[in-house]
Amino acid sequence: CNSIDKAIKNNGCVHIIGLLSRGGVHSHENHINELITLAASRGAKEIKVHAILDGRDTPPKSAKESLTKTESICRKFGIAKIVSIIGRYYAMDRDNRWERTQKADKLIATGESEYVAGSAIEALESAYARGETDEFVQATQISETKNKYVILKIDAVIFANFRPDRARQLTHAFVDEKFESFDRGCNAKLNNFVMTTDYGSGIKIS
């Protein structure tokens, strides 16, 4: 709540990242949806959801129901939107294949992606047409105008995954002061970053 309130006070955005899944192994979609509700109830002016797709602890083409449910909740509040989707193959690597993590980092931090779609469902259907399943969906920005977003220092970022092992690499990219595994470009270290559990492995949130 403190991070959300801080972002609201500074006219920042609340970003929610997480594995949008009913699998319950690394996360649960209900937690993401409740975080949207929480941020809206506390007065957030803008909420951006970055959906990581499963297809491993769930059937390989099962994301549509989860995305539809979350989109419905976003529409209910009018200030929330799914702004990106990407498969867990990229966003949740745990074996130092940093080229995968970099794709997720660029998508979430700056909206840089291989693909752009007008809605999350459109993005998913396009991925299926390319032969991708949920786990392997390539980085896609969701935007009707193709305008890129950037996570700012005044924003709050909440990572909703509750299992640490596959959340660490992406978290390191976001919060490490001296991150060197790939070039983050001008992306600043995020100061208002929240983990829903202790991801360990030397991660320090200042």
Task: Give the positions of each predicted feature.
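…; additionally, a secondary subgroup of soluble metalloenzymes is captured
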Residues: 1-206
